[in-house]
Curated annotation (Swiss-Prot):
Example GO BP: L-leucine biosynthetic process
Natural source organism: Haemophilus influenzae (strain 86-028NP)
Record's subunit section: Heterodimer of LeuC and LeuD.
NCBIfam families assigned: leuC (TIGR00170), PRK05478.1 (NF004016), PRK12466.1 (NF009116)
Protein name: 3-isopropylmalate dehydratase large subunit
Length: 469
């Protein structure tokens, strides 16, 4: 029977499936961080259980840490408590932790692939909704809740119901200046933020194949923003080249055997998908969100839609509420919107490719007078090291940006990098919900190049019209 890639991954990890019951899956890799793991470890202690497979779990500090200091003792409040708890719990159980004293530390979905912990064919879970990022490698990866974190620590398994399969094909090649972020925002704009509900999405097509692994991670990272359980891209030579010689990747004959297996990880030609969506790559322009969910997005040259012209009453009400919060009116041209802050970072867009794109825009330019702050936050210590080796940090600083240490930073209002009330931000993160970047903060999701350009010109511009240096 022909199968989709998702079906192959799911079926090959079933440990036990009783008739009429939810299957139990084996979990190859478990990634943890300081926010969703403390209660899970407490649960283990209360039940007098041990971590079943210590070598399958890896931790990092990212969500609540400061991007300005690297000393745990200088952290404050809840952040300090969470970080110290993670340190205590990993030491007590023998779990490998990439803490803030190491250059390997970083955002969990940047650190995992960098270290070769993310491999094709795996099941990967983390107490974080953007775990779908790892699906870029042909792994079945999804976020889980804290009680499930405890269950995986104790059993290395997880009950998981089958999802539907969706194929999203992006045909042809994108135009110059169009990035992975534009592709995924255009997809979400077409499907809406609920279009993938109940599905695992496989992204395919020439435009997807042309992406680097960094770009593919950006696409899969935001699969959750269209309601999908997970996102997948079948592994290929681009995948193998990225993984070769990574610290935790197979070596020698094991590598050869692994690649031979990985090459089988693709949907069969006659596999049946429950839902199929197609986009033409040539039609995708630079994207900017105008509302309070990632599906409220249009091309930079368009005007904000009029809610009264929306046939769906739910969509109309959502748009009206979003415009009231975001402080904009229907018919406004996106290129007339000024920004107060710029954030370049997050598990969506904080890798070296993203920073290079931002630097190409900022080189030789200065921050616009109306822009209060530009934060550039690398996704890991290794990304930071590489960026500084290339001199990107000097470009950012010369342009008036702040060059920070690795962390989730302003993606979410959980640390000390936040927007002020009613400030407007051009952000490379993945969510533009109300208050996501700080109380009453207003977020517009864009690519790294678009964010950098907004910082230099003080408003949204079409990156295709900006000279790159």
């Amino acid at each position: 029977m022909a199968k989709t890639l998702y079906e192959k991954l799911f079926d090959s990890h079933i440990v036990y499936e009783a008739e009429g019951e939810t299957p139990i899956l084996y979990i190859n890799r478990h990634l943890i961080h300081e926010v969703t793991s403390p209660q899970a470890f407490d649960g283990l202690r209360v039940a007098n259980r041990q971590v079943r497979q210590v070598n399958k779990t890896f931790g990092t500090m990212d969500h609540s840490i400061s991007t300005q200091v690297r000393d745990v003792n200088k952290l404050e409040g809840q952040a300090k408590i969470q970080v110290l708890e993670l340190d205590k719990n990993t030491k007590a159980t023998g779990i490998k932790l990439f803490d803030i004293t190491t250059k390997e530390q970083g955002i969990v979905h940047v650190m995992g692939p960098e270290q070769g912990l993310t491999l094709p064919g795996m099941t990967i879970v983390c107490g974080d909704s953007h775990t779908a990022t790892h699906g870029a490698f042909g792994a079945l990866a999804f976020g889980i809740g804290t009680s499930e974190v405890e269950h995986v620590l104790a059993t290395q398994t997880l009950k998981q119901a089958r999802a539907k399969s969706m194929k999203i094909e992006v045909r042809g090649k994108v135009a110059s200046g169009i990035t992975a972020k534009d592709i995924i925002l255009a997809i979400i704009g077409k499907t809406t933020m609920a279009g993938g509900t109940g599905h695992v999405v496989e992204f395919c097509g020439e435009a997807i194949r042309d992406l680097s692994m960094e770009g593919r991670m950006t696409v899969c990272n935001m699969a959750i923003e269209m309601g999908a359980k997970a996102g997948l891209i079948a592994p290929d030579e681009t995948t193998f080249a990225y993984l070769k010689d990574r610290p935790h990747a197979p070596k020698g004959k094991d590598w050869d055997d692994a690649v031979a297996y990985w090459k089988t990880l693709k949907s069969d030609d006659d596999a049946q998908f429950d839902t199929v969506v197609t986009l033409e790559a040539k039609d995708i322009a630079p994207q900017v969100t105008w509302g309070t969910n990632p599906g409220q997005v249009i091309s930079v040259n368009e005007t904000i839609p009029n809610p009264q012209e929306m046939a769906d009453p739910v969509q109309r009400a959502s748009a009206e509420k979003a415009l009231h919060y975001i402080g904009l009116e229907a018919g406004t041209n996106l290129k007339d919107i000024k920004v107060d802050q710029v954030f370049i970072g997050s598990c969506t867009n904080s890798r070296i490719e993203d920073l290079r794109a931002a630097a190409a825009v900022m080189k030789g330019r200065k921050k616009a007078d109306n822009v209060k702050r530009i934060l550039v936050v690398p996704g890991s210590g290794l990304v930071k090291e590489q960026a500084e080796k290339e001199g990107l940090d000097k470009i950012f600083i010369a342009a008036g940006a702040e060059w920070r240490n690795p962390g989730c930073s302003m993606c979410l209002g959980m640390n000390d990098d936040r927007l002020g009330e009613w400030e407007r931000c051009a952000s490379t993160s993945n969510r533009n919900f109300e208050g996501r970047q700080g109380r009453n903060g207003r977020t517009h999701l864009v690519s790294p190049a678009m964010a950098a350009a907004a910082g230099m010109f003080g408003k949204f511009v079409d990156i295709r019209e900006v000279a790159l240096n």
